[in-house]
Structures are given as C-alpha cells and as structure tokens.
C-alpha cells in the first residue's frame, strides 16, 4: 500500500514537471526599444511592408488593407494600438499575418522580426492581475531568454476594437 502511495505521488510530480517542461516557440519582434514575443502557432506568414489601401472611418491604428495572394487582410499598427509613437517604416519593418479563430487573418506592423526562441513553462511568468493598464494590458506573460526579458503579447487584446 505504501508503495502505491509513493507511485501516485511520483505520477503527480511527473505531471507537474511535464507542464513546466512543455516548450513553445515565439517570434521575437521589436517595437521601439522593447522586445515582444508572439506565439508562433498564431503566425501564418511574415511579409515585407507594402502599399496599403486606407479604409475610411476606422480607428487610427487600423492602417488599411492589403491583398495577399487574393485575400484582403486588415493591417493594424500595434505601435499606435499600444500607445507608442507612429510607425517609422524602414527596411526592417514587416507585416506579420496572424491566423486568429474569431477574427480570421489579420496583419500587424512590427519594427523588426528578430528571431525565433523556444521557451519552457519554467521560463514564462504569467501576469496574474486583472487591472492591467497602459502597454501592459497587451501582454499576458513575460518570458526570459538568455538573460533578456520578452513581453509575450496577448493577441486578443491587440485585435479587440474596444481597446483602441
């Protein structure tokens, strides 16, 4: 009986350990001087900055639409959405095409795509408070990779219209 109890304890410990060892890949992007991570499972494509068609009577952060392989996609400036200065378009500027369940595909403008990193549960700290404000409301966790902090974006907050 004692052996069975010990085995059950080990099983629970193993389950907790597996959860913390599960790894997720993130694309690290730069906005201004800050680094953010986007879960790679939500990324459909990364394309160079291109000409957009403006749409009238929409929030300022909705920069327009692009035609990508016959699909018309809205493009959001997450700099404006998050309260940064307007986008400065450079050779490093990219549009990341996100594939989201509710909204479908949507593009977000980022200053630079830096790298892909793999983070385990041990390297990610969830933000547990509900009353997030400012730029923090657009992140849901912080990851640590090679001694650097990466704010992990909450894509639902980025794409919600009410949070302009």
Question: What is the role of each PLM region?
Answer:
Residues 1-164:
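An acidic, low-aromatic, low-complexity terminal/linker signal
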